Amino acid sequence: MIEIDHVTKSFGDYVAVADADFSIASGEFFSMLGPSGCGKTTTLRMIAGFETPTEGAIRLEGADVSRTPPNKRNVNTVFQHYALFPHMTVWDNVAYGPRSKKLGKGEIRKRVDELLDIVRLTDFAERKPAQLSGGQQQRVALARALVNYPSALLLDEPLGALDLKLRHVMQFELKRIQREVGITFIYVTHDQEEALTMSDRIAVMNAGNVEQIGTPTEIYDRPATVFVASFIGQANLWAGRQTGRANRDYVEVDVLGSTLKARPGETTIEPGGHATLMVRPERIRVSMDAPTGDVAAVRATVSDLTFQGPVVRLSLAAPDDSTVIAHVGPEQDLPLLRPGDDVFVSWAPDASLVLPGADIPTTEDLEEMLDDS
């Protein structure tokens, strides 16, 4: 187990990580996700030993290693640039670590052959790095980092140098390799798809703070803050006020020019308090007629349509001029819509979530965060 015990890291007056407090289980695929400057890489560097906490402690298997040098910690790091030895074969690159530890030849061969089999590079053992694709080079770097059996492997945006299609392939390869070797992987990324695809749990970070830790499903379906909701996936976020409780299970919020029943979040909001209602675009139904049953519904006017393959992305204007985004698939069986058409948009109360506050990041804010990552 790895414990981050109330860790703060400051550089002068700048606080890069503020009171981070969480643990990572042995054998877990744990991701730290967030925009540039959120503190994820600094946290990884403190686990690796490249930075020292200003406050708090880092423990590996119960031992405080906060001031232990990197070479004395049983962890290895894979960076975006793999730093393979160009003059060595794949086999010799992987064997470098065990040789430097002066293991026996038989043990070295056993370990290297085992790792090359796991990363599916046995047939490439005699090639040089320049003869490999980017994905193959990355798997060599993984094998080299794993061959000494570290207690944890730290990965700092290792897929960033690959093209989009290869990144998708390598996401599944990384998860497969992690399951086969059973070693803790701690993965840093600003790419939400990578984190959602591979992780057992995710820590979402923003401005030095850990905003939420949970499984991919928990992070996506029940974000704890407006930032998490806006950063993970696509979400409709409408600012309003919570007026009270509808019943034991739901609250009422004034948004979109209506009072709507919605699922409360984890944070208690007093009646009249600022609130944000979140609904994912894929949870919204669009209909020509007023919906029936226990749903939240408002009138809306089609502003724009974009074909996106399996769905059509509809942008609609609500009565209060707020924008509603809906992803409409063929199962909704709608007639051909055009800008200016009046429709109803609706969703089940369980498909919504009320979050505290009404400070919603703009699209430009999020794009700037990601551009800097």
From Swiss-Prot:
Residues annotated for ATP binding in this entry: 34-41
Recorded GO MF terms: ABC-type putrescine transporter activity; ATP binding; ATP hydrolysis activity
Catalytic activity reported: ATP + H2O + polyamine-[polyamine-binding protein]Side 1 = ADP + phosphate + polyamineSide 2 + [polyamine-binding protein]Side 1
Cellular component GO terms held in the UniProt record: ATP-binding cassette (ABC) transporter complex
Record membrane topology: Peripheral membrane protein
UniProt-annotated location(s): Cell membrane
InterPro entries: AAA+_ATPase, ABC_SmlMolc_Importer, ABC_transporter-like_ATP-bd, ABC_transporter-like_CS, Mo/tungstate-bd_C_term_dom, P-loop_NTPase, PotA-like, PotA_ATP-bd
Keywords: ATP-binding, Cell membrane, Membrane, Nucleotide-binding, Translocase, Transport
Enzyme Commission number: 7.6.2.11
UniProt-listed SUPFAM superfamilies: MOP-like, P-loop containing nucleoside triphosphate hydrolases
Segment forming the signal sequence: none
Domain ABC transporter, chain residue ranges per copy: 2-232
Assembly: The complex is composed of two ATP-binding proteins (PotA), two transmembrane proteins (PotB and PotC) and a solute-binding protein (PotD).
Functional description taken from the UniProt entry: Part of the ABC transporter complex PotABCD involved in spermidine/putrescine import. Responsible for energy coupling to the transport system.
Family that this chain belongs to: Belongs to the ABC transporter superfamily. Spermidine/putrescine importer (TC 3.A.1.11.1) family.
Protein name: Spermidine/putrescine import ATP-binding protein PotA
